[in-house]
Design a protein with these regions (language model features):
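Hot-dog-fold acyl-thioester-processing enzymes
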Residues: 2-88, 150-166
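HotDog/MaoC-like acyl-thioester-processing domains
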Residues: 1-18, 99-103, 108-166
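Generic detection of short hydrophobic beta-strand segments and adjacent strand-loop junctions
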Residues: 24-29, 93, 143-145
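Mid-chain, well-packed structural core segment of small domains
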Residues: 82-103, 107-109
């Protein structure tokens, strides 16, 4: 992830700036993606795998698995392995709209809080909105990452949202 932090001689980096935002490149969802994800997970629900069944349903066509969309979002967000130690959690996951074959998704991410844990690490919380090619939100999630670089003597900072990400 692009950050304002810089590497130091010890190999650590500052935590990202509060409020920092990034919009990723896009990725178009293909039929092969649906088949591959179904094969990997064993989720062959007809909404994803049966064109005739899906055509008669709520969305009128096959749509991507919600977890596939979330997994691809993780792959779209660039994280520096020298800074990001581990994914610590996902919270407030919601799937707002279907993603169909041929849709292109991208991720808008914002740093919402930085909480120093010790002399070398912080817990950084990101608000992610997964958008389609029409800039409509298809999914939202709060992502917590263990970040190398901030120190415990730095104050905890947080953005207190006055609205829910839509």
């Amino acid at each position: 992830m692009s950050t304002n932090g810089t590497a130091t001689e010890t190999g650590t980096a500052e935590a990202p700036a509060l409020g920092e935002e990034l919009i990723t490149r896009g990725r178009t969802i293909t039929e092969s993606d649906l088949v591959s994800f179904s094969s990997l997970t064993g989720d062959w629900h007809p909404q994803h795998a049966d064109a005739e069944w899906a055509a008669a349903g709520r969305f009128g066509e096959r749509v991507a698995h919600g977890m596939m969309v979330l997994s691809y979002a993780v792959g779209l967000v660039p994280f520096d392995p020298e800074r990001v130690v581990a994914l610590r959690g996902l919270d407030s996951v919601s799937f707002k709209r279907p993603v169909a074959i041929g849709d292109t998704i991208r991720v808008h991410t914002r740093v919402d809080s930085v909480r120093p844990l010790d002399d070398e690490h912080s817990l950084v919380s990101f608000a992610w909105r997964v958008l389609n090619q029409h800039d409509r939100v298809v999914a939202r999630v709060r992502v917590d990452a263990l970040w190398r670089g901030a120190t415990a003597d730095e104050p905890e900072t947080e953005i207190v949202p006055n609205t829910v990400l839509l």
